[in-house]
């Protein structure tokens, strides 16, 4: 029997390494893997038919569902997750130490609709500061960091408007010069890792702040998922289901290795213990059987609406409904 080809593009995150190395079987499927770098380019190639499935922004995917776009079938495969309290930056001499202190401040960002910056604003809102409580400044982070082009179908502007930096002006320079008070970005400034760097994280004890968010809300934010073209999913549902099982198996191999060795960082063993203690309901990062994953789906839909990213709130039950229908039809 001939194999069904499935062209998949995603980044080589550690838990996906077994799949990239060929250590996971995909019965009936000729899985052709592409190592993604620029996900906006990857998304364009997905929509143009260059890939059958790819890593996509969870926020932009959910925005599409909210607007009635069913061109993609999302898998409940949360391949990139993490908190974003850590992604707020200020000058090293700034008096700001908590997100609630951002009220009335000038805040810069290089992307409004990325999932990461959406979760950064969710963290800010969780602290009691609403979107319209700050003065937003949009612009390019630095000459070395490319700014993503706006996507008319999924991108929007801040409620209440925003100032735009002129061409040739950059957010990191504006922060250093005192023109803005803080920035949030997915691209961590290199100065953060220098003792004498110009910038520091706004939330100094971000692990404690993120742990508190997790305790109160019950989930770890999801950033990227896997999605397939609807035409491919409907033509080859078994191939998509085989991919889903392969992703789970890749994670299981990685997790077993991580627990056994735990040597990739000095206290990795402690991190493993924390994962087992506090995040058991979120491992593996697949499926909606987990209460934490259902809370995540509901929260992102609510947050998008309250941030003004969509005119109507998406039904969280619809985010992965198409994939669930494929699975149930087996």
Regions found by a protein language model. Name each.
Residues 227, 232-306:
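Secondary-structure end/capping motifs
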Residues 147-259:
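Pocket-lining segment of extracytoplasmic ligand-binding domains
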Residues 2-7:
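Extreme N-terminal starter segment of soluble prokaryotic enzymes
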Residues 10-145, 152:
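Short, glycine-/small- and polar/acidic-enriched structural segments
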Residues 131-136, 271-272, 311-318:
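Short, surface-exposed acidic
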Residues 305-330:
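Conserved C-terminal helix/tail region of periplasmic/extracytoplasmic solute-binding proteins
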């Amino acid at each position: 029997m001939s194999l069904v080809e499935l062209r998949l593009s995603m980044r080589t995150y550690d838990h996906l390494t077994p799949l990239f190395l060929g250590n996971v079987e995909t019965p009936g499927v000729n899985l052709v893997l592409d190592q993604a770098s620029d996900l906006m380019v990857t998304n364009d190639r997905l929509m143009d038919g260059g890939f059958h499935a790819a890593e996509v922004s969870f926020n932009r995917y959910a925005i599409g569902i909210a607007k009635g776009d069913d061109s993609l079938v999302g898998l409940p495969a949360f391949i990139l997750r993490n908190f974003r309290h850590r992604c707020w930056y200020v000058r090293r001499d700034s008096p700001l130490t908590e997100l609630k202190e951002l009220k009335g401040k000038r805040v810069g960002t290089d992307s409004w609709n990325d999932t990461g910056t959406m979760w950064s604003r969710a963290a800010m809102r969780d602290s009691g500061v609403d979107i319209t409580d700050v003065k937003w400044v949009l612009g390019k982070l630095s000459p070395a960091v490319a700014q993503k082009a706006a996507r008319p179908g999924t991108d929007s502007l801040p409620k209440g408007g925003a100032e735009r930096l002129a061409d040739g002006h950059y957010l990191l320079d504006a922060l250093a010069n005192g023109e803005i008070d803080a920035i949030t970005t997915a691209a961590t400034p290199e100065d953060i890792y220098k003792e004498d760097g110009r910038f520091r994280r706004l939330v100094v004890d971000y692990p404690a702040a993120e742990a508190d968010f997790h305790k109160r809300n019950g989930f770890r934010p999801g950033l990227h998922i896997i999605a397939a073209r609807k035409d491919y999913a409907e033509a080859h549902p078994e191939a998509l289901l085989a991919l889903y099982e392969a992703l789970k198996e890749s994670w299981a191999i990685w997790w077993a290795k991580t627990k056994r060795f735990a040597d990739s960082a000095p206290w990795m063993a402690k991190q493993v213990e924390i994962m087992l203690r506090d995040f058991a309901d979120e491992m593996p990062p697949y499926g909606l059987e987990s209460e934490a994953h259902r809370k995540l789906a509901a929260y992102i839909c609510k947050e998008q609406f309250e941030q003004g990213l969509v005119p109507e709130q998406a039904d969280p039950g619809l985010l992965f409904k198409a994939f669930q229908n494929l699975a149930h039809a087996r």
